[in-house]
Amino acid sequence: MGLLSEFKAFAVKGNVVDMAVGIIIGAAFGKIVSSFVGDVIMPPIGLLIGGVDFSDLAITLKAAEGDVPAVVLAYGKFIQTILDFVIVAFAIFMGVKAINRLKREEAVAPSEPPVPSAEETLLTEIRDLLKAQQNKS
């Protein structure tokens, strides 16, 4: 089997395709969460603490000189990134929790006993007939 056909067999497997779809959806979800945090959550928080825009919060370590830009610690962006992470982690936690609950419900659901095969049914009837004959004698 050639390298190309091996790769094709690997790439077409369900798990690889599912993983790729998950990564793409995860990246899109990350962008949505970043927008949610930056555009919806942080402005009211900034307003509550005095009209501060968190993305602008920074400590200047060295001022700009000529063409050399300033060296800054942009801790406001870091706070937003931490909030992004917390929201994504919480969403993943809730998703995993829901999946685990569904798995537990499936495991707890009583399964019907297997229907005996025709051979087992016949053997059971023969056993019962032999016991009945033994009890008569």
Swiss-Prot record:
* Gene Ontology cellular-component annotations: plasma membrane
Subcellular location(s): the record lists: Cell inner membrane
What keywords are assigned to this protein? Cell inner membrane, Cell membrane, Ion channel, Ion transport, Membrane, Transmembrane, Transmembrane helix, Transport
Query: A Gene Ontology MF term for this entry?
Result: mechanosensitive monoatomic ion channel activity
The highest taxon in the source lineage is Bacteria
Gene3D superfamilies, alphabetically?
Large-conductance mechanosensitive channel, MscL, domain 1
Topology in the lipid bilayer is annotated as:
Multi-pass membrane protein
Q: Which residues cross the membrane?
A: 9-29, 79-99
Summary of subunit composition and partner proteins: Homopentamer.
Q: Which family does it belong to?
A: Belongs to the MscL family.
Its biological purpose is as follows: Channel that opens in response to stretch forces in the membrane lipid bilayer. May participate in the regulation of osmotic pressure changes within the cell.
What's the name of the protein? Large-conductance mechanosensitive channel
Native species of this protein? Answer: Pseudomonas aeruginosa (strain UCBPP-PA14)
